[in-house]
Structure formats: C-alpha cells, structure tokens
Amino acid sequence: MSRYTGPSWKLSRRLGISLSGTGKEIEKRPYAPGQHGPNQRKKLSEYGLQLQEKQKLRHMYGMNERQFRTLFNRAGKMKGVHGENFMILLETRLDNLVYRLGLARTRRGARQLVNHGHILVDGKRVDIPSFSVKPGQTISLREKSQNLAVVGEAIEVNNFVPDYLTFDADKKEGTFTRLPERSELSAEINESFIVEYYSR
C-alpha cells in the first residue's frame, strides 16, 4: 500500500483527526467529507475501530503500510508494552523530529526538507525521513539551507517544543535529549486498538 498523497484536509475529516497539526480542518468542518458528511458518521464495529485507529496513526506520520508494519514488528521485539514502544519509535523518526522542532509546519513539509537534503544529523546530511534518531543526536540545517523562507516562517509560528527536545532558534538546531514518555505523545490515539488489529 502506497503512502497517501491526496488532500490532507479531506483525509483528516474522514479520520476525525488533524493530520496537519493545526486542527483547522477539523475545527472548520468537524464531519466526514462528501454530500452527506454531517450525517454519515456511523457506529463502527470492533474491527472498524481497530482499522480506523491504525489508519489515523499511519496517516498522521505519513507512512505506507509496509513501513508502518515493519516498525510495529520492531516494537514488538522490545522490552515493555508493545503499543507504547511503537508510539515512541514513531516519534524518533527524523521527519517527525524536524516537525517537532518547528523547522516545518507539517510532517509532510518536514519530510520534504529531509528528502531534499536540507537536514543534518550530528553534522552529516541524512535524506531518509524514516531515519531513527537516537537520544543525544543533534538535528540542524545545512549551511546553504539556513535562510529557507519556509523554515523561517515555521519557526516564527511555532510556540511549543516538547520536553524531550531542546532547540536553538538562532542556530536553527535542536537536540533529541531523551526518549519521550507515552504521556507526552498524542492522546488522540488508542494504540491498543492497533495492537489488536495486527494480532488478528
């Protein structure tokens, strides 16, 4: 299954969660897209709830099914709670941390920065969005990319950096100081549904 590249607002409304991170798409029209959107929310089966939760999280991080399932399986081999480990591994993705630092306004925008070679990890260029950043590693912009308008605009509007990151806006550089706690991650996701979905 390929990664979704269609209109993110329409998908956000279908899943009932903001994929842009701004919440505007849900705030403006808090119902599914289509002619009968306001009236077509129906009660989902147990399987439907599990599938919806998986789709929410997969699209939130902009991953295809193969990438998502591979990371899920990796989380299952770690000590601790499978679902929580999965959420934490997702958070360590380079494109996600570029977004969390405020260098991009959306995860999609962060993924483009990484793909186009604008991002350094510990001073070395990394152009793989799924690269897993380790605690203690530093994320920064290439010298030639320091004055990108999209980055400056993103930093200007960002007013929150998670406690597991530090960020120097002048240097446009951040450090992933530690792994996040589950309580610091999205409360809109019930990862136990995803574990149940893949355990069928």
Curated annotation (Swiss-Prot):
Region Disordered: start-end pairs: 22-41
Residue intervals of the S4 RNA-binding domain: 92-152
GO biological process: ribosomal small subunit biogenesis; translation
UniProt cross-references to Gene3D superfamilies, sorted A to Z: Ribosomal Protein S4 Delta 41, Chain A, domain 1, RNA-binding S4 domain
GO-annotated cellular components: small ribosomal subunit
Gene Ontology MF terms in the entry: rRNA binding; structural constituent of ribosome
InterPro entries xrefs: Ribosomal_uS4 (IPR022801), Ribosomal_uS4_bac-type (IPR005709), Ribosomal_uS4_CS (IPR018079), Ribosomal_uS4_N (IPR001912), S4_RNA-bd (IPR002942), S4_RNA-bd_sf (IPR036986)
Highest taxon, organism lineage: Bacteria
Stored Pfam families: Ribosomal_S4, S4
Keywords, sorted A to Z: Ribonucleoprotein, Ribosomal protein, RNA-binding, rRNA-binding
Subunit structure: Part of the 30S ribosomal subunit. Contacts protein S5. The interaction surface between S4 and S5 is involved in control of translational fidelity.
Function per UniProt: One of the primary rRNA binding proteins, it binds directly to 16S rRNA where it nucleates assembly of the body of the 30S subunit. With S5 and S12 plays an important role in translational accuracy.
Family: Belongs to the universal ribosomal protein uS4 family.
HAMAP family, sorted: Ribosomal_uS4_B
Protein's UniProt name: Small ribosomal subunit protein uS4
Source organism: Lysinibacillus sphaericus (strain C3-41)
Name of the encoding gene: rpsD
